[in-house]
């Protein structure tokens, strides 16, 4: 079972403060473990334009049609000071890894320098930090019913409102997660 380019959808009973109601996009999954980015936990008061300002990056030439007020996600509890950019191809940047035909992850500054310009990839999600599982750990969590899995959907990854991603990811596999046991305030 390879879950690369899949979503992990937290089960309602998962109460870990970071992973509660989270959707994790799996970037890599192999015999050594897994790595992913949480796509629905926005960092408070941090947007893409704030990251660019902190790094002293000024988009040139600026394309006013491209919004830089999108939230930056908490990608996970590891390396929270390190940026990870999920985006659509091309993968011409110096530190890019193709995850699927339609998704790439880049960690180099050169992708940030394109944000807000005509050179920016068509879809972008910026995160600080990442999530990781050791060999066999994710498989055990799946057996323990901590997560649901679904093939990744680019609309959910890049376009669905952040607050709806958990519910909509579960709908991909026909589950209304808001009515499952363990969801407070719902029958």
UniProtKB/Swiss-Prot annotation:
Paired cysteines (S-S): none
SUPFAM superfamilies assigned: VC0467-like
Secretion signal, residue range per the UniProt entry: none
GO cellular component, one term: cytosol
NCBIfam families per UniProt: PRK00228.1-1
PANTHER family: UNCHARACTERIZED PROTEIN YQGE, UPF0301 PROTEIN YQGE
Protein family membership: Belongs to the UPF0301 (AlgH) family.
Protein's recorded name: UPF0301 protein CKO_04323
Species annotation: Citrobacter koseri (strain ATCC BAA-895 / CDC 4225-83 / SGSC4696)
Source lineage: Bacteria, Pseudomonadati, Pseudomonadota, Gammaproteobacteria, Enterobacterales
């Amino acid at each position: 079972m390879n879950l690369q380019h899949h979503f992990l959808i937290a089960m309602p009973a998962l109460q870990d403060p970071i992973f509660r109601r989270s959707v994790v996009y799996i970037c890599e999954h192999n015999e050594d473990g897994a790595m992913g980015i949480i796509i629905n936990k926005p960092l408070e008061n941090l947007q893409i334009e704030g990251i660019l300002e902190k790094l002293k990056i000024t988009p040139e030439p600026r394309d006013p049609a491209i919004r830089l007020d999108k939230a930056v996600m908490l990608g996970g509890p590891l390396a929270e000071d390190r940026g990870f950019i999920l985006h659509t191809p091309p993968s011409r940047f110096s530190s890019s890894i193709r995850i699927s035909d339609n998704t790439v992850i880049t960690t180099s500054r050169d992708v940030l320098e394109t944000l807000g310009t005509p050179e920016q990839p068509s879809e972008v999600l910026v995160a600080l930090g990442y999530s990781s599982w050791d060999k066999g750990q994710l498989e055990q969590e799946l057996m323990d019913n901590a997560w649901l899995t679904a093939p990744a959907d680019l609309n959910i990854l890049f376009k669905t409102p952040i607050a709806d991603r958990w519910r909509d990811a579960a709908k991909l596999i026909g589950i209304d997660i808001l009515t499952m046991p363990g969801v407070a305030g719902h029958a």
